[in-house]
């Protein structure tokens, strides 16, 4: 009797573990990454007042094109290779956004001097905004909490992209949970084209 029950119990245990694993996988798949969770599509982006790489101050309205603005929130153009690669891709993609009435801008905690160096090195023609004390990053709820004050990375955001209409209303948010990955600009362009 004992030898008959043993394989049955083993099979039951394996089936139970398999069902548990499937349930766990389904539950994990249901949890989607929500970048900037305090800001939803349809919300107005908090007011922006920031200086660019030339020391010129910009508001959200001044940054916007006829149809809107693509605002890229980046970690650093000084030491983050993923941000630098994204910046280079943005330089290549800017004309496509301009053609549909969208301006582009980036925002980081980098100093104005660092942003000026980035402009010269990567030949940008759009505003690279300095977020003083990461005030906007904090207001948007995207401050990377992994770093403590005093760490050189303190003040960086979780990177992502806002597609804003010409009234500063969020029409799309694009981000990857892994900071090393960035949304493809073809997807950003599609989101911008959908703005009426």
Place the predicted regions along the sequence by residue:
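Short loop/turn microsegments at loop-to-beta-strand junctions
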Residues: 45-46, 71, 158-160
